[in-house]
């Protein structure tokens, strides 16, 4: 059960990331996008939050823990099958926001250290190497605004503004540290809250209300990445976020395609103790 669910989620992300790598290799998007070629040995730096480190519910930790079943691990396997060796360094932290990425003070970086400084140090050490970097941020900055089946519009505006201010700091630091043979890829976000549509009329209203929030989040991220010539993987598209055609679910009857995709690909429609579970985690700081 666990392997099936985690594999299903991770494979979707892997497919999108692989496409993005192919695009950078063919189109040479930006000075920092060298692409990867068959036979290469590439350093792979995985920056981000819960999904970046493969957080999944397990029998011992039903609410989730880091695993080796995330998209980064499967991207390594996918690359190996095409003749590219990725040496993976996962430095992400469950619940990481853009603030804690910069300042630390999270469950993973409790001293003066932080994920951003570790990422910069890694890139500087491997400045002359072929390097792939995936950046998976933003969700934990806004998830606090989507609580108790309510969209807090004031909170959304505040957090989007903070995200727009912090992202340039992060992306500038990363791009300045990269060498000429580095490929950076941003990771967009799916909408786990669509799953609320299977739990009653009030929750269905919430599911629709937060669609604009996730769309705005992806827009903010894409704009920020574009300023640094970093392509963004369209995760929302791969999760068929805008597909509303009704299909039959063996569990929930007729439901929209986008809701069915979330239920099949995440733990959001799973009963306790393993769900509902956002993955990424809802824990965040400011």
Locations of the language-model features?
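Serine-esterase "nucleophile elbow" of acetyl-processing enzymes
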Residues: 32-95, 133
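Secretory targeting and sorting signals
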Residues: 2-30
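Flexible, glycine-rich phosphate/dinucleotide-binding loops
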Residues: 28, 53, 97, 193, ...
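Acidic helix-start/capping segments at beta-turn-to-alpha-helix junctions
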Residues: 90-98, 238-241
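Acidic/histidine-rich helix-loop elements
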Residues: 55-69, 97-110, 154-158
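Aromatic-acidic/polar surface patches that form glycan- and anion
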Residues: 64, 68, 210, 277-285
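Alpha-helical cap/lid subdomain in secreted, periplasmic
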Residues: 110-275, 282
